[in-house]
Regions:
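An alpha-helical, amphipathic repeat domain used for nucleic-acid recognition
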Residues: 1-157
Length: 157
């Protein structure tokens, strides 16, 4: 039993699947992209639901990979990760239910130290502020600054 799908719905679904083939995105982002292409709201909702039901659009998987990428590649702290998640448009319920699980294995203190070593600055305050802007806690940033600057002092001797 196949359902009859109007032609506009087919075009919208095809466009959505093409977008998802190139890059993962949230349902919110997909809706915005399809709206920008001029599709009707009804066909956009159909396409998003189609992609969700068939597993082409999996926000939980995307959220997990996005968090891992920000923590492991950019060495962001939890606060900056939360900001980036908000900017991407993930649903609040999804984030609330899964954030703790996805970040439990990430060593933010170690990431903070790595980021401080990667971006050595001679000024203690500038380095500390840089780490805070990267989303690390004050305690982690202070410890990283202390370690990196003590290593720099040891190198000079």
């Amino acid at each position: 039993m196949s359902e009859i799908i109007p032609e506009e719905y087919k075009r919208t679904v095809k466009s959505a699947l093409n977008m998802l083939a190139y890059a993962d995105c949230t349902a919110n982002q997909l809706e915005k992209k399809l709206t920008a292409k001029g599709y009707s709201q009804e066909s956009i909702e159909f396409a998003v639901n189609y992609a969700l039901q068939r597993g082409y659009l999996n926000e939980k998987r995307y959220l997990e990979r996005f968090i891992e990428q920000l923590a492991n590649t950019k060495l962001y702290g939890l606060n900056r990760i939360a900001l980036e998640i908000y900017k991407k448009g993930f649903s609040l319920a999804l984030v609330r239910d899964n954030l703790g699980e996805f970040v439990k294995d990430i060593d933010f203190e170690e990431n903070c130290i790595k980021l401080a070593q990667k971006n050595k600055r001679s000024d203690r305050n500038k380095l500390y502020e840089y780490l805070i802007r990267a989303g690390h806690t004050g305690a982690h940033a202070a410890k990283a600054v202390k370690i990196v600057l003590s290593q720099a002092d040891d190198d000079e001797i």
